[in-house]
Amino acid sequence: MSNPDATHPSGVPHRELGRTREKVSAIGLGGWHLALPHVDEPLGIRIVRRAIDEGITFLDNSWDYNDGASETRMGKAPRDGYREKVFLMTKIDGRSKKEAARQLDESL
């Protein structure tokens, strides 16, 4: 098994995520702020890409942040070669199997 506490060249520590064997940054970037009224889409995408360039590889979001706009922007940012560098995570709050499935479909 690889060193679970390896450090990215940027200095950001990376660890294995649970049993996945995926290495992710110990610090993540949350997506809620990416679609606030004063953050336009190009700025939101620049924020995500800058975080990735600096060694942040764990991106956290939720299907209902800013009516889905945050997730949409975070989904656009990893284009152009960035997708292979990140681990995307989203949250749902559905309390039934049907609602959880709907939210996951909406997220994808």
Where are the predicted features?
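A short, structured active-site edge motif that brings together acidic residues
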Residues: E84-S96
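N-terminal binding-site loop/beta-alpha segment at the start of enzyme catalytic domains
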Residues: M1-K85
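Glycine/proline-rich, positively charged
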Residues: V39, R95-L108
